[in-house]
Structures are given as C-alpha cells and as structure tokens.
C-alpha cells in the first residue's frame, strides 16, 4: 500500500468520524481478489469503520481504468453516475486522488466539488504530457464550475498554482497528517527483522520508482563505506504490487556492485511499519527526488523513531527540519545524503532524544489530520457539521 493509500484511508476515517451517521457515500474501485495490492485485513478494517458510520458503499469494477487518462476519465464519469442518486440538494462530491480529477466535469450543478490530488504527473512523470494535460483539464473544469482543490502541503499548493495554473483562491490547505488509527499501525503487529538487522539497521521504504531516490541512498551508503564509516545493515523496502519491476532489478544490481550489506524487500506488508518502533533502528531515511508530501517522517515521529534523514524534496522540507526534527540534504545528491546519514549515525543519545521530541511536537501541532479535515469541511460543507451538531444535542 502506497503513502497515498494510507492518506486516503485516513481521509475516509476523518470523514466517518465528523459526518452525521448515514451521510457518507463512498464509491471505491474494487481490486480483483488475486490482485497483489489487495490487503484483506485492511479491507476488513475499512469496511468495519464505514459500517459503523452508516456509510453507503457503492463499489466500481474499474481497476483496469486506473492507468491511463482515457480510463480515468471513464472512471470519473462512472463514479459520478453511481453516486448521482445521493447528490441532490446539499451535497459535496470529493474526487479523492488523481484518478478522480475529472469528476467535476460530470457532477450535477447542485453538488459542490472538492478535488484532493495527492500527486501529479508533472511532479513524478514530467515526460507524460497526455496525463498532465488530462489532469490540468480536470482541475480547470472543476474550478471554473465553482469547485475547490485541496493542497496536501505548501509545496503542493505552489505546484498547483504554478505548474497547473490554478488561482490561489480556489486552493484550500489540507496538510497531510496522521489519525490515531495511523499511529496504531506504527505500534501494531511487527514482522521479524531480516537476518543481519538485529544488531542495528537503517530503514528506508516506499514504492519502487526512481523518484523515491533509493539509488541515491545506495550510492550514499557506498560512499560512507569507502570512507571507512560503519553503516548498519540497510533494510530497503522498495515495493511494487506485481512482479519484480526493472527498478527493483536495478537496485538489486547496485547493492551487489557496491558491496552493501542490505536486505531488499520488493513486496510491501503494512507490518513493516512496526520496525519504526524497534530499538535496533539507527536511522530512517527518505531519499526522495520528488515528494508531494511524504508521510514516513510523520510515522517515524509517531513511533519515536530516528533520527530521520530526508531530502528537501517537496513536502519533506516542511517536516524534516535540519538539526531540529532530523537531518536533511538536497535531492539527487548522494554525496550530501551521505553527510546527512553520517550525522544521524553519529548523533548522541541526547541529540536523538531532542530530535524525537521535536518531531513528536511538530506532528501534534501541525499534522493532526482530524483537525485538518474538519477545517476543510467547515469551508466546504458546514451544513454537514451543523447537522452533526444537531444530532449530538
């Protein structure tokens, strides 16, 4: 499950908690039973949460449509058609993430529209001109019709208003964050550590794509080794949902060529987040070249893990503040990343405690996701919150 998946679940959880019983309607894309990205326990947990909220769940069979602009356009139309019986009178239609950026083109005039993109092609696949054009059209049509767009970070706001040309006034701040359930995942069931990691390890995890910067991390570890710096065992979770992809093959070859002591895991299991609470953990590294937000530092702060080492790519610059909540380096610079990682490994117990305390404080003060979602609802659907207040009284 990607960071976007965790964030979308947190968004649903916040809505389920804030909205009156029975008001929430969810139109999810159903993955086939054998799909490698499907997590049965995750599914059970979400279904239970939605049932408790009295939510109506209207599933779509559209997994094959998620990979192209034409498919996403059709998926957006199907989703609105499925939800349309519930969109009369006061209603808010939320297009949650990129595949649903075109819902504003099909929404009935009576419905307000909010789009919540968690990334864009311009950020992670700048060569994909057709996808970028489709995203721009969906965003533009929505705001032209009076809809709004949520920005998950300051960087994403600048990106939406700059690269995609949205007026500043139509972009709402919805800073990404954690719900209590997300923090429970960090402290939940744990997989056994890989062999070699029990005496100390460095952890990095994310999707197996070049923009995550894992090759830069491997080169940084190699540079430290060349300098005689003892780097603990690297546990690299570079995950995909299918067969091993070309980037994973490249990473495996790089580990072998550089002679790095590392474990490469190519399939994601939510239980790996439990490693953030392991006392053998020496550092958490987020080496991204591009990052709309980046949840892993927050998860590390929630677990008291670290030090956190991250690049300043995108939203990471908001959470990993050099010398305050962690150590930072410019993106796509193995040399600078090696310096930051060396600082983390050399940090004294007092420094580690200070960084962890500052990270926990930043999480509590700026990234309480329940507070962020409620703030957006107060702007987009105050009538729903008023109804909830009326029910409570």
Which positions does each model-derived feature cover?
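Membrane-proximal helix-turn-helix segments that form the acceptor-binding/catalytic region
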Residues: 129-149
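A charged, aromatic-enriched C-terminal amphipathic alpha-helix characteristic of glycosyltransferases
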Residues: 3, 349, 353-380
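Conserved acidic donor-binding segment of nucleotide-sugar-dependent glycosyltransferases
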Residues: 322-323, 327-334, 343-349
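Aromatic "clamp/platform" in nucleotide-sugar-dependent glycosyltransferases that forms part
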Residues: 289
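Nucleotide-activated donor-binding/catalytic signature segment of Leloir-type glycosyltransferases, i.e.
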Residues: 248-270, 275
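Short hydrophobic beta-strand element within catalytic cores of glycosyltransferases
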Residues: 306-310
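A conserved mid-protein helix/loop that constitutes part of the nucleotide-sugar donor-binding site
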Residues: 6-10, 209-225
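Carbohydrate-associated surface elements
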Residues: 155, 177
């Amino acid at each position: 499950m990607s960071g976007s998946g965790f964030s979308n679940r947190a968004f649903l959880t916040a809505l389920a908690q804030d909205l009156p019983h029975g008001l929430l309607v969810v139109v999810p894309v159903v993955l086939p039973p054998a799909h490698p990205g499907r997590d049965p326990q995750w599914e059970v947990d979400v279904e239970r949460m939605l049932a408790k909220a009295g939510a109506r769940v209207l599933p779509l069979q559209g997994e094959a449509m998620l990979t192209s602009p034409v498919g996403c356009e059709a998926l957006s139309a199907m989703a609105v058609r499925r939800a349309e019986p519930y969109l009369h009178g006061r209603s808010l239609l939320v297009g949650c993430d990129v595949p649903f950026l075109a819902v504003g083109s099909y929404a009935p005039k009576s419905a307000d529209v909010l789009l919540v993109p968690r990334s864009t092609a311009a950020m992670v696949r700048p060569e994909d001109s057709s996808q970028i054009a489709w995203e721009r059209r969906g965003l533009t049509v929505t705001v032209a019709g009076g809809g709004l767009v949520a920005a998950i970070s300051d960087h994403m706001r600048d990106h939406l208003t700059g690269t995609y040309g949205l007026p500043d006034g139509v972009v709402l701040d919805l800073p990404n964050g954690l719900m209590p359930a997300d923090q429970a995942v960090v402290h939940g069931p744990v997989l056994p550590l890989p062999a070699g990691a029990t005496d100390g390890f460095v952890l990095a995890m994310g999707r197996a794509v070049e923009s995550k910067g894992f090759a830069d991390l491997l080169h940084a570890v190699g540079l430290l080794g060349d300098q005689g710096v003892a780097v603990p065992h690297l546990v690299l979770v570079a995950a995909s949902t299918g067969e091993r992809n070309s980037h994973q093959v490249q990473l495996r070859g790089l580990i072998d060529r550089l002679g790095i002591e590392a474990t490469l895991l190519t399939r994601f299991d939510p239980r790996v987040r439990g490693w953030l609470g392991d006392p053998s953990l020496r550092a958490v590294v987020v080496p991204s070249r591009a990052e709309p937000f980046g949840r892993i530092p927050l998860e590390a702060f929630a677990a008291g893990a670290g030090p956190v080492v991250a690049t300043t790519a995108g939203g990471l610059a908001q959470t990993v503040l050099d010398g305050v909540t962690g150590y930072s380096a410019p993106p796509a610079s193995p040399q600078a990343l090696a310096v930051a990682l060396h600082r983390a490994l050399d940090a004294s117990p007092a420094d580690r405690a200070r960084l962890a305390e500052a990270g926990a404080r930043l999480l509590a003060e700026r990234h309480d996701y329940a507070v962020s979602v409620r703030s957006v609802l107060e702007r987009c659907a105050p009538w729903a919150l008023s109804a909830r207040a009326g029910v409570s009284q």
